[in-house]
Amino acid sequence: EFDNSSKNMLETRFGLVPESFKLLKNGELPLVVTDYVANGSFASLKANVTLYQEPNYAYFIRNTDLKSGTFEVFVDEHSYNFLSKSTLYGGEIIISNVGDVGSVFLCPKLDKPMTLGNNIIMLRPEQENLRYYLYIWFKWLYGQSLIQGIKGGSAQPKFNKTDFKNLPIFLPPDDLLEQFHQIVKPMFELIDENNMENQALTRTRDTILPRLMSDELDVSDVEI
């Protein structure tokens, strides 16, 4: 049983923390940290990546898309394959690191392949029970303050992957981390299900509405 009595707590910059927690750096976690530019030089990216405003092979996931919940930029199959170091499968933690620094999202699962856009970094835990703990940590007050503490640049705030990997993080013991994961996992899965249902409804609306407007679809006999 977890004991959080004061005699088992340590005073830290984050306040009182159980002495059983480990203080690590992000770079010491079993975690893949990558971004768009990990795939090559700016010249090679320009030569091999083409963005489209109409549907194509894969989604190009940007910070603005994650904020709005609408995904309207795409890449072709060649671009997607070239960007293999930043492929998204859903469930990754995405953090904006240029401009709007510190926005944190869980990558949704969409109906096409996905690849990471620019100005954001992606975290893919190799240990499943780290996923939601890390997401909440970076959304939380202290996680946010740590991220804001490493941003530089006057005209356009930003931070780099190296500084991010050097940030401290408190990690609970494995048994407590697993308990936490099992408690919050159903909540996040329900959110995912609702998001997928919303996407399906949006696709249905976008298919039917033009047919209604053009009188191609007759609903005059439908009883409400």
Regions found by a protein language model. Name each.
Residues 1-44, 166, 170, 174-215, ...:
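Non-catalytic DNA-recognition/assembly elements of restriction-modification systems
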Residues 27-50, 59, 63-90:
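Sequence-specific dsDNA recognition surfaces
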Residues 34-39, 131-132, 145:
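Acidic/polar loop patches that form or flank catalytic/metal-binding clefts of enzymes
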Residues 62-63, 82-143, 150-155, 160-161:
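A short beta-sheet element
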Residues 78-81, 110, 123, 186-192:
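Short, contiguous acidic/charged loop-to-helix segments that flank catalytic cores in large enzymes
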Residues 121, 132, 148, 165-171, ...:
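Glycine-rich beta->alpha junctions and the first turn(s) of the following alpha-helix
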